[in-house]
Every structure is written in structure tokens, then in C-alpha cells.
Amino acid sequence: MTFEELEDSRELYNDKITEVKNLRERAELYSQYKKAYKAYFVNYQLQATFTDIKYNHKLGIDAFTLSCTGLIDTGDTYYSNDLINAKYKTVNFTQADVEIIKQSEGKFTEEYDPVAINQRSDTVFKGRFLIFEFSKKIFGRVAILPVGTSSFFTNPVVKAGLKPIETESTHFNRIFKIYAEDGFEAFYILDPAFIESAEHFADRYCYKVALYFIHDKMFIGINDGDDSFEPPDPALPIDENKERAKVIEDMKPITDIISVLDLL
């Protein structure tokens, strides 16, 4: 894929979109543009940064992978795409964009129609999940959630039997709620170096980071509302330098986690 071919794809979209009325055909036109964008920008930058890469922009982390932890609710509607399986230096990882939607009962009004479905959709998570191999294998489960996390995320942890604990770090306890099946196992992970690194990482991502430890895996959710690796409006010419910088920025959480949390 060359930049000229990407621009051809964008121009083809603009030439045909006004003629196409069928929604499915319109979506297919945009899909072709998106595919070209990700082949040129995203795949190139992944190849330049990581090794052992398997990237599929249509696939994601399946809901079962998260729900089988017993700690993460995947809601009523679950979307995931931009699946990356790769290695950064010596660390294997998986990451994908994830959106989780929960249906909740709305309030009845005087105009309530009993035939209509009276529900409200709430996006409870929009961001990314990352899965890493973790060097410290544990036999229990540990969840570290941002203070103020909604009951949607705390309820599964409590139902799984994890108990709240605190560290000796006042600041860490102020920004995170820690739940563990076994306190001894939790403190095996939460040594002073890790606590300091996690505080730094959470600060970098505005305290919207949740960490889950299950055996030799670490799951990290960043609920920042971002949808990474998405193309710009096809109606406008593509600024190549701007888009390349944006893709590099979208990749940054992966390298940040590995570097800041000292997973190497």
C-alpha cells in the first residue's frame, strides 16, 4: 500500500458516496477506505515498532476472554476491533479497542407505551484492553480499580469473593481500590517498585486505568473514551505527517505499560 493508493481509495469514496443510497453499500465504501488507511499507516508503524505481529482491524478481543476471568462484566452489547498480537522487545502482548454497553431500565413517563422497550443504553467502557504475560505468577486473583469506579465493575469483583485490602502507600490507596483473593499473593505483586510505577502510569492516563492479575496474565483496561487507529474524515485530504504522529500516539500506551511497569 502506497500513499497514492490510499488517496485513490479516499477519492473513490468521495466520488461514489453521493450516488449510493443503500446503507450497506455506503458502509462497504467506507470500509474499503478504512482498510487502506490501516494498511498504510497502522500496519507500517506496527512493523516498525514490534515483532511477531498479527494485526486484524476487524477482529478484537472476544468477550469470553474477558468474562472468563470472572472479574470483568462484558455488558449487554460488546464491541471490539483493531486486534494486535505482537511482541515488544521480550514481552508478548495482546491489545484491542473495546466498547461495553449496558442496558438499564428507563423511567416511565405519562406517554409510556407498554409495547415499547423502555430502556436506556449506557456506554460503561470505551477504550482499550491489553493483556500481558506477567513475570510473577500467582494462584489467586487481584483487581486494582480506580477510586470512583462504578458498581458495574466492582460488583463482579466482589461477587467473585475478592476482599478489599490496602497497601502501605497512602497515595496508592487514595487513587486505587485493591481487591484480592489472598492478601499475601497481592503483596507479592504490590511491592514498592510496582506501586510507584502504577501510580506514575495511572497519573499519565488520568486515573482511568484498571489492572487485573490472573495467574501469569495481567489485564489492563484504559477507559479513556478513545477509539484508536481510526482514519480521518475522508472528505478532507490526508495530512500524512499528522496521521503518522497520531498512530504513534495511539501505540504509546503499549510501550508505556511495558516500560513504566518494568515488564521487560
Positions of predicted regions on the chain:
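Long, contiguous non-domain N-terminal segments
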Residues: 1-44, 48-49
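Charged, low-complexity intrinsically disordered regions
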Residues: 40-264
